[in-house]
Design a protein with these regions (language model features):
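Noncatalytic alpha-helical scaffold of FAD-dependent oxidoreductases
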Residues: 1-256
């Protein structure tokens, strides 16, 4: 059922198991001169088993700074990390980041500091949204390909004359390209849709996927078909028919 996007059934009851919330997680923020160094650092930081590992590109940072100045004027990228365990290793994390050209960094187990550190990530989408209409979705790539994805999307931004910011979950390569275009400008909207399609194709060419967490729905069915073999598609359709012979569960979604 997981990942079927409502095409195989409905949930009538959920049993939730809650983990104990860590008392004093360590929150770490680090700035880098460019996305390459930040992405390389993110890959190296996985050994610390972070509960959060977020990355923000320069375009998004500029949008945030123009709205709520937070001191990221010279940063090319920002990493945010949280350690629920081994909080005392925060200094070790910052030391490792230094080997990846870190400009500046800080760590704290104080809750108020954590809120302030994470603020830039909370403002990422709203900051881009205030610039115009947005087309936001997600793609996922191997962590080692995050920098290349961002650099190729920057080229698309120039090609289509659009602002495209990227932020997302560096811990699993799930990125959120956010395309900004003028409200009411139909030609700009068409360019945004074309850019969106190319972003998905870039992700797929890098060994990634059309969707990391937002799902396929109806918008990405064609891209999903490009990733799956005919045999896999037929198997999925057979499973759908077995669970939903009348085709009444979220019809027309997910399946290519």
């Amino acid at each position: 059922m997981i990942g079927s996007e409502g095409t195989l059934g409905i949930i009538t009851e959920i049993v939730v198991g809650l983990a104990v919330r860590p008392e004093t997680p360590a929150t770490i923020i680090a700035t880098f001169p460019h996305i390459k160094s930040a992405a390389a650092a993110a890959a190296a930081l996985l050994k610390f088993k972070p509960s959060m590992l977020e990355i923000i590109d320069q375009t998004t940072l500029k949008a945030v700074e123009s709205w709520h100045p937070l001191g990221f004027e010279i940063a090319g990228s920002v990493l945010l990390m949280q350690l629920d365990e081994d909080q005392d290793r925060a200094d070790e994390v910052l030391k490792l980041c230094e080997s990846f050209e870190m400009i500046d960094g800080a760590a704290s187990t104080d809750a108020a500091d954590a809120v302030e550190f994470i603020r830039v990530r909370k403002l990422a989408y709203p900051a881009l949204e205030r610039l115009g209409a947005t087309l936001l979705d997600d793609v996922a790539v191997p962590i080692s390909k995050i920098a290349e994805l961002v650099e190729r999307v920057e080229a698309l931004s120039t090609k289509y004359d659009l602002t495209i910011g990227i932020f997302g979950h560096a811990g699993d390569g799930n990125m959120h390209p956010t395309i900004v275009h003028d409200h009411g400008d139909l030609k700009a909207q068409e360019r945004a849709i074309a850019a969106f399609g190319e972003i998905v194709e870039i992700a797929q060419s890098l060994g990634g996927t059309a969707s990391g967490e937002h799902g396929i729905g109806s918008i990405k069915q064609g891209f999903a078909a490009a990733e799956l073999s005919p045999a896999v598609i037929e198997l999925q359709r057979a499973i759908k028919k077995a669970f939903d012979p009348k085709g009444i569960l979220n019809p027309g979604k997910k399946l290519p």
